[in-house]
């Protein structure tokens, strides 16, 4: 997954983060100090391509948030694949968004941030099942944040053990755990 760092997206705050925990520079500035700030006129897409080239990355997956991802994928389809970002709190809208973006933009994946939703939506919550079923139907992998979240939000919705039931109920679902599943890496590998 690749994110475009630009002045508009550099201080994204998930809706579940309390006001006092939103940070001055970014949502995790209590852990990460002196993070560079992108200027308005920086070309985030070209900088990303340059960084990909420098690191031997041929193609990258970008989430359809803001305008940069779609612009990048349309201008450089050989370099960028698109991913739909959904909030399971509105189940039918999430399913429709997956279908619409897959048809219009040929998205290659779906993602959601369980502890970033407001209210939180656990990995194994009933609201996620229509999303998983749609991913199986369209042959799309789903990227789900797993383990302790970076922002100061409650992490139970992302507990790695919650994948067990989902894996059992959806044997054909391709799941990609994001953010390392820490501190339950061994459990993640077993699942």
Give the role of each language-model region.
Residues 49, 98-99, 132, 164, ...:
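Short hydrophobic/charged patches on amphipathic alpha-helices used for structural packing
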Residues 50-58, 76, 137-138, 169-175:
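A structural motif corresponding to the C-terminal end of an alpha-helix
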Residues 59, 65-158:
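Active-site gating/metal-coordination segments in enzymes
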Residues 157-167, 186-191:
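Short loop-to-alpha-helix "cap/lid" segments that border enzyme active sites
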Residues 1-59:
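An N-terminally biased module of ancient metal coordination in phosphate/nucleic-acid-related enzymes
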Residues 103-108, 160-175:
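Structural recognition of alpha->loop->beta junctions
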Residues 1-4, 145, 179:
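Histidine-centered divalent metal-coordination motifs
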Residues 174-191:
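H/E-rich (His + Asp/Glu) clusters that bind or coordinate divalent metals
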């Amino acid at each position: 997954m690749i994110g475009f760092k630009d002045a508009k997206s550099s201080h994204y705050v998930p809706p579940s983060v309390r006001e006092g925990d939103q940070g001055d520079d970014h949502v995790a500035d209590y852990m990460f100090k002196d993070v560079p700030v992108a200027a308005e006129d920086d070309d985030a897409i070209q900088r990303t391509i340059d960084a990909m080239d420098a690191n031997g990355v041929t193609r990258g997956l970008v989430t359809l948030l803001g305008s940069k991802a779609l612009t990048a994928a349309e201008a450089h389809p050989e370099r960028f694949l698109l991913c739909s970002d959904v909030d399971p709190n509105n189940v039918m809208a999430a399913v429709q968004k997956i279908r619409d973006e897959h048809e219009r933009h040929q998205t290659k994946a779906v993602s959601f941030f369980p502890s970033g939703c407001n209210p939180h939506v656990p990995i194994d919550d009933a609201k996620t099942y229509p999303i998983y079923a749609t991913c199986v139907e369209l042959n799309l992998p789903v990227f789900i944040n797993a383990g302790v979240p970076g922002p100061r939000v409650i992490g139970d919705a992302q507990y790695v053990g919650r994948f067990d039931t989902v894996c059992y109920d959806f044997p054909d679902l391709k799941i990609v755990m994001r953010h390392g599943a820490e501190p339950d890496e061994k459990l993640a590998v077993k699942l």
